[in-house]
Amino acid sequence: MTSSFFTDVIKTIDNEYASLADDGISAGDVSSFIDTGSYIFNALLSGSINGGLPSNKITALAGESSTGKTFFTLSIIKNFLETNKDAGVFYFESESAVSKQMFAERGIDTKRVMIIPVATVQQFRQQSLVVLDNYLKLDQKDRKPMMFVLDSLGMLSTTKEIEDSEAGKETRDMTRAQVVKAIFRVLTLKLGKADVPLIVTNHTYDVVGAYMPTKEMGGGSGLKYAASTIVYLSKAKEKDGTDVVGNLIRCETKKSRFTRENKKISTRLFYDERGLDKYYGCLLYTSPSPRDGLLSRMPSSA
């Protein structure tokens, strides 16, 4: 078929996301990666120490309570804002777990972070889409780098759950998983079109009755399908003498469209403004052979 026929079809179907593959796929192609502030974590996410978070995809950080998901995210935000002087972050917050002091102590420019409290998945959907639609209305040359954060998906309620609680009903909301899936179906294309990354924190739980000890991410299958990368976090304390100064975070890719799945690394996260240790873990996985790259030397859980 001729390219002119394809062009005519694109005009006819009136789909803003349609394009010839040869011209690039606006919502699918990754134009750049965002440095996380840790070389080893960059390699885990993208296969390169100079990579990091894909600039237009959803990345999920999951773990049990107090594994450092929020602190980990704050460290990525800090590095993103320092690298991009005109950038901004929209932080959708459902846990009431962050404060201005927490941002300031970690060296984050609080004037470039907007905190948006959200209570339900519907509220998150509506407000995030409003921000994206306004961003897409700008001329491309006027769009400054932007990042979305949802902290956390697991704490979001639903409109039905709140209405049932107010009415004194104790019934479980069986629609939540479907609502979450619907939200990410809409957001995935919008984020790709706008070239905006979304970091989602979520909780994990032990699967009852599993043959082997197994962790599962909460919230249904919506995030599992929508996220390009899902990383499970666990931690051990990092001490300076007797003082706990941070955590050693073990990261495992449960899903990845850019690197191998089930790879594991460890990185160091300080509680203060240092955040993620840029060089921690690199020496262990550095290979003397050019054919045996850093990623291939990472241990696998498989």
Describe the residue ranges of each PLM region.
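Active-site phosphate-binding and catalytic loops of NTP-dependent enzymes
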Residues: 50-51, 137-138, 235-241
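The Walker A/P-loop phosphate-binding site
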Residues: 2-112, 128-133
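Interfaces that engage single-stranded nucleic acids at replication/repair/recombination sites
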Residues: 7, 11, 291, 302
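Phosphate-binding/switch region of NTP-binding enzymes
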Residues: 173-282
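Conserved inter-motif catalytic segment of the P-loop NTP-binding fold
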Residues: 26, 64, 75-76, 80-182, ...
